[in-house]
Amino acid sequence: MLRWPWPKVIAHRCGGALAPENTLAGLAIAARIGCRAVEFDVMLSRDGEPVLIHDETLDRCANSSGTVAALDGALLMATDVGERFHHAFAGETIPSLDAALRRCRELGLAANLEIKPAQGHEVETGRVVGRRLASLGPGQRPALLLSSFSEEALE
């Protein structure tokens, strides 16, 4: 019988029931309540920046709208996704993949990184994420599991 090496409880979308989903605040709260691993979703911005967001649009999580794949990374990373969740999180923004990996490492969290490409961007999203991870040296990334509903993104 294989032994599962990962924690049995993983904070989905960085603990999105307790903090704005897929945010650095969510990572901190997940660690604070004792989670040892988190799951987060990664999509690409128009200019190829991998950012943490679940939906293809901003509509559900932000007080603004737009399609993630049609917006630049700098704009996405300045988008407030905290206020809509609760006023106590006002100013919490969409993090870059780099920021999330750094924070996971600091907090000692393992991560299930779900590659969530916009339609038509499957291969590109997988490659960008793969290159970003490969560029990190030893000790620069947390324990990591890659997942996706897109086979192409994982190739």
Would you name each region that the model predicts?
Residues 1-155:
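Phosphate-group recognition and catalysis centered on beta-loop-alpha active-site segments
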